[in-house]
Curated annotation (Swiss-Prot):
Its EC number is 3.5.1.5. InterPro entries: Urease_beta-like, Urease_betasu_sf, Urease_subunit. One of its GO terms (biological process) is urea catabolic process. Heterotrimer of UreA (gamma), UreB (beta) and UreC (alpha) subunits. Three heterotrimers associate to form the active enzyme. It is an enzyme of class 3 (hydrolase). Its main location: cytoplasm. This is Urease subunit beta.
Amino acid sequence: MIPGELFPETGDIELNAGRATVKVAVANTGDRPVQVGSHFHFYEVNPALAFDRAQVKGMRLDIPAGTAVRFEPGDQREVTLVPLVGQRQVFGFNGKIQGAL
């Protein structure tokens, strides 16, 4: 083995296989771009993003880890979300939960 050597599997990797998803229409009502990372608790994103927040409590974007979605001012698009898993406790972000979902 060579340091840093990779042994990739063949074929495609399906993200969040078997997990329930929700599609939500999101609009940036602000005058600045808003970027949301892959593991950010979507319920707590920038208030300039308009959508049904109650529907997305405990969810994050269904995109590869380390990536993000950018909403330009006036943009409206549909995003796919998946539930947070594990202990389903949320701390930090914008401080709206600070505990169990």
